[in-house]
Amino acid sequence: MALSTHLQLLQQKRGTIKWEVKNMKILSILMCYLLGTILTGEIVTYIMTGESASKLGTSGNPGMANVMSHLGIIPGIIVLLGDILKCVCAMLIGYYFIDASKTGILIGGALCTIGHDFPFWRKFKGGKGVATTCSVIFIYGPMAGFISLIVGLLTVIVTKYLCVGAVVIPLIMIPFAFKNNLIDGLLMTGLTLLMFYKNYPQLSIIKTHQAEKNDIIAGLKNKLGHK
């Protein structure tokens, strides 16, 4: 009888632990998304102008490129660092509380990117997730990530279209992710499709030469020349 009672208590304890672990994973998923909804671009823009980033330029994008274009290099760098920091925090949560592997890192980063792209408090109209996606890619696979970032940068320099380079970066990482495992490959494919979706308005008008061009080299020279 005592042994039977002891076994029942053990089973109940295991069930409680499983339930707690499940709840922790759900909470971690929510935290990763919520971290993504902290838009550094909105904070920096409000501090500098007293207005929302939605009023910056024609796009109203709270990302680094738009902030740098209208407010300067330093504010743009601050936005970049803020977006990288929140993504790193989300990836750490993913690793320690969702799955202690590269998959956990990818899940955390992907959720943060979704939060950045679709923040609930901004009527789900956020950034394009370029900085967060690049952060995920580099930490997920430093060597392959570095290569994809360089290729993406060269693509922007050659084509002068940021939207093209933004899609190329995660696209290159898909084979590397599938090589690791199926789930990682599907997650990386999802990030690529998300990047394509967020950049589709610009991609769709490239042929008509109406898409916004980004001459990085000329832009930097111009910015530095005004200092």
Where are these regions (language model features)?
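Short, Lys/Arg-enriched N-terminal segments with co-localized hydrophobic residues
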Residues: 11-23
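Helix-coil boundary and interhelical linker segments in multi-pass alpha-helical membrane proteins
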Residues: 21-29, 89-107, 138-144, 176-187
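N-terminal signal-anchor transmembrane alpha helix
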Residues: 24-49
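Cytosolic, membrane-interface loops and tails of multi-pass inner-membrane proteins
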Residues: 43-74, 204-227
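Interfacial segments of multi-pass membrane proteins
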Residues: 68-71, 94-97, 115, 130-159, ...
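Core segments of transmembrane alpha-helices
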Residues: 79-93, 130-131, 145-150, 166-170, ...
